[in-house]
Amino acid sequence: MAFTPFPPRQPTASARLPLTLMTLDDWALATITGADSEKYMQGQVTADVSQMTEDQHLLAAHCDAKGKMWSNLRLFRDGDGFAWIERRSVREPQLTELKKYAVFSKVTIAPDDERVLLGVAGFQARAALANLFSELPSREKQVVKEGATTLLWFEHPAERFLIVTDEATANMLTDKLRGEAELNNSQQWLALNIEAGFPVIDAANSGQFIPQATNLQALGGISFKKGCYTGQEMVARAKFRGANKRALWLLKGSASRLPEAGEDLELKMGENWRRTGTVLATVKLEDGQVVVQVVMNNDMEPDSIFRVRDDANTLRIEPLPYSLEE
């Protein structure tokens, strides 16, 4: 990517975040174009893409035959097909899997590194962007396109915007916002996604979890009414037979080191500690707090105490901004 990522700063929680412009270099864009795009994606992802309008974006999962996610995709309509945003570490293997059946369809599936991904969040983010675009997305219209730019709106953990654009517009936005906005890299957007309870699937956890283990059903990412797609039988079984015993949790506290994706944590059981869960993502905030996104049993007691393995510090469950009740 020719557009240079901004230097890192320690991320801040949404409630205290000043106006911030972020380069999303740890995320990557991919596209599907061609006459069969919608039909092809409908047979590959958990969401009902045939019902998607130009004004919507959604989080869908792309699964293997056993219902385990290669990746989750932030999906929106783009040109005569679709585009999606996923973690850069999983894009290449995810596209390889997606292309396996494409030989029989009129589609072109490709990575897109020409466009730039930026995030805008923090204090008065909407007001800052209102000076630069004629229309901004909102709850009613979550995707807005203007020229070479697509803007995606997010409600949680606080209003924020993801911008997909060309290099010239990215440079213009940076020049216009540089004076009033802090600049940061992907870690700040990652911190906001963790706070929002959006599952982060990096390479270490690709092919490990069914979508419901990461709360995708609570985020509107699974249609149980659409036709066949890869992995559907297992995803449906998890819902209708209660086969899923896991959920995505948000933990906050302190830790002397940050656990890596794929690592387990320890749960306090009386005087002892027992290994539990799988870490998806972690960040350390500027106030020293550590936030951890982890998949664990879905029946954890709300007052449970956790720690990074053999650590002296502890982590506790924080509420997510959505309900898991079905």
From Swiss-Prot:
Gene Ontology cellular component list: cytoplasm
Keyword tRNA processing: yes
Compartments where found: Cytoplasm
Name this polypeptide is given: tRNA-modifying protein YgfZ
UniProt source species: Escherichia coli O6:H1 (strain CFT073 / ATCC 700928 / UPEC)
Primary site of residence: cytoplasm
Sequence similarity: Belongs to the tRNA-modifying YgfZ family.
Alphabetical keyword list: Cytoplasm, Folate-binding, tRNA processing
Any GO BP: RNA modification
PANTHER family the UniProt entry points to: TRANSFERASE CAF17, MITOCHONDRIAL-RELATED
